[in-house]
Amino acid sequence: MAKKIGIEQSLSDVEAALKEKGYDVVMMKSPADAQGCDCCVVTGLDNNVQGIADTVTQAPVITASGMTAEEICSEVESRIQ
């Protein structure tokens, strides 16, 4: 079964890269969307923008700020193994 990765809506390039690698990608529109995700990727523009870092999820949260889509994919892979 594909790992479920939650991402913020503005990260469309990351969404495409993760889907290409076989991940199940869901858009996080509210903190509840992070539940059940194996990993979450946030922009980092507004720290804890959706309350995701407030232990809504036990999954790793990756801040995408300053990273390319490929770097984010590598980080996701290393965090969910």
UniProtKB/Swiss-Prot annotation:
Segment forming the signal sequence: none
Domain of life: Bacteria
Family recorded in the similarity comment: Belongs to the UPF0180 family.
NCBIfam families, alphabetized: PRK03094.1
Protein name per UniProt: UPF0180 protein YkuS
Annotated source species: Bacillus subtilis (strain 168)
Name of the gene: ykuS
